[in-house]
Amino acid sequence: MAKKDEHLRKPEWLKIKLNTNENYTGLKKLMRENNLHTVCEEAKCPNIHECWAVRRTATFMILGSVCTRACRFCAVKTGLPTELDLQEPERVADSVALMNLKHAVITAVARDDQKDGGAGVFAETVRAIRRKSPFTTIEVLPSDMGGNYDNLKTLMDTRPDILNHNIETVRRLTPRVRARATYDRSLEFLRRAKEMQPDIPTKSSIMIGLGETKEEIIEVMDDLLANNVDIMAIGQYLQPSKKHLKVQKYYHPDEFAELKEIAMQKGFSHCEAGPLVRSSYHADEQVNEASKKRQAQA
């Protein structure tokens, strides 16, 4: 664990091999031309080159690029957001179709300034992608929408392939890590989503390295399973800037492998766990695995 004013040295296993090809450069050019945002870029995701260049998957960030919250782990800009762009859903869908994406993840900044939390634009984005790229699987990754479950229903009625909502950290650290969200509200959000559409897989992820214990990580697993979450992702927290929370521990890949084994033994249909794993990492594979498990249980 890091001492109060100590910065840990980043270990060798966190060095990233950069892959760039026409998929990567084409998608990046398309984003700029269409005034679109991706969480891959805004949140400084370490897997952007693999996802864009190799796997042909991308995570679009809608509802603008400014978040109304200021979570202490997140690199996305915060402040007063711009007005909603009602043409954004069509531009996202056009980009998905043009790039022939296998899997599209749609996330958003938190829009606590909007009565519907942005659910209307979220839902229209899903519908637009369905029209223009019917073979692309769609994962939605909303905020907790302030715990308004009518807004969640608006989104779930579009029947995405996966509903993803991140609990982010263990119960004890939640007030410090994301002060404007609550651990139990995230669990309730996931439970309600499954109740609304029981056949749609649900997913959640946590970052580790913020000072949690192994027992607390396992408690998160149990809490997610108790609320019928199918898929879990576990990744290393990386400090985006000096103003964000410091890394307290860098977990070894072997520790991630052990956590994945525990999660699978407990009953998740899929668990991604590794130093560079993020919420949408290998998301295209998770759709297929969750579908196979549901078919086997039918």
Swiss-Prot record:
<dbReference type="GO" id="GO:0051539">
    <property type="term" value="F:4 iron, 4 sulfur cluster binding"/>
</dbReference>
<dbReference type="GO" id="GO:0046872">
    <property type="term" value="F:metal ion binding"/>
</dbReference>
<dbReference type="GO" id="GO:0005737">
    <property type="term" value="C:cytoplasm"/>
</dbReference>
<dbReference type="InterPro" id="IPR031691">
    <property type="entry name" value="LIAS_N"/>
</dbReference>
<dbReference type="InterPro" id="IPR003698">
    <property type="entry name" value="Lipoyl_synth"/>
</dbReference>
<comment type="pathway">
    <text>Protein modification; protein lipoylation via endogenous pathway; protein N(6)-(lipoyl)lysine from octanoyl-[acyl-carrier-protein].</text>
</comment>
<keyword id="KW-0479">Metal-binding</keyword>
<protein>
    <recommendedName>
        <fullName>Lipoyl synthase</fullName>
        <ecNumber>2.8.1.8</ecNumber>
    </recommendedName>
</protein>
<feature type="domain" description="Radical SAM core">
    <location>
        <begin position="53"/>
        <end position="269"/>
    </location>
</feature>
<dbReference type="InterPro" id="IPR007197">
    <property type="entry name" value="rSAM"/>
</dbReference>
<feature type="binding site">
    <location>
        <position position="40"/>
    </location>
    <ligand>
        <name>[4Fe-4S] cluster 1</name>
    </ligand>
</feature>
<keyword id="KW-0004">4Fe-4S</keyword>
<feature type="binding site">
    <location>
        <position position="74"/>
    </location>
    <ligand>
        <name>[4Fe-4S] cluster 2</name>
    </ligand>
</feature>
<comment type="similarity">
    <text>Belongs to the radical SAM superfamily. Lipoyl synthase family.</text>
</comment>
<dbReference type="InterPro" id="IPR013785">
    <property type="entry name" value="Aldolase_TIM"/>
</dbReference>
<dbReference type="Pfam" id="PF16881">
    <property type="entry name" value="LIAS_N"/>
</dbReference>
<keyword id="KW-0411">Iron-sulfur</keyword>
<dbReference type="GO" id="GO:0016992">
    <property type="term" value="F:lipoate synthase activity"/>
</dbReference>
<dbReference type="Pfam" id="PF04055">
    <property type="entry name" value="Radical_SAM"/>
</dbReference>
<feature type="binding site">
    <location>
        <position position="45"/>
    </location>
    <ligand>
        <name>[4Fe-4S] cluster 1</name>
    </ligand>
</feature>
<feature type="binding site">
    <location>
        <position position="51"/>
    </location>
    <ligand>
        <name>[4Fe-4S] cluster 1</name>
    </ligand>
</feature>
<feature type="binding site">
    <location>
        <position position="280"/>
    </location>
    <ligand>
        <name>[4Fe-4S] cluster 1</name>
    </ligand>
</feature>
<dbReference type="InterPro" id="IPR006638">
    <property type="entry name" value="Elp3/MiaA/NifB-like_rSAM"/>
</dbReference>
<feature type="binding site">
    <location>
        <position position="67"/>
    </location>
    <ligand>
        <name>[4Fe-4S] cluster 2</name>
    </ligand>
</feature>
<keyword id="KW-0808">Transferase</keyword>
<keyword id="KW-0408">Iron</keyword>
<keyword id="KW-0949">S-adenosyl-L-methionine</keyword>
<feature type="binding site">
    <location>
        <position position="71"/>
    </location>
    <ligand>
        <name>[4Fe-4S] cluster 2</name>
    </ligand>
</feature>
<keyword id="KW-0963">Cytoplasm</keyword>
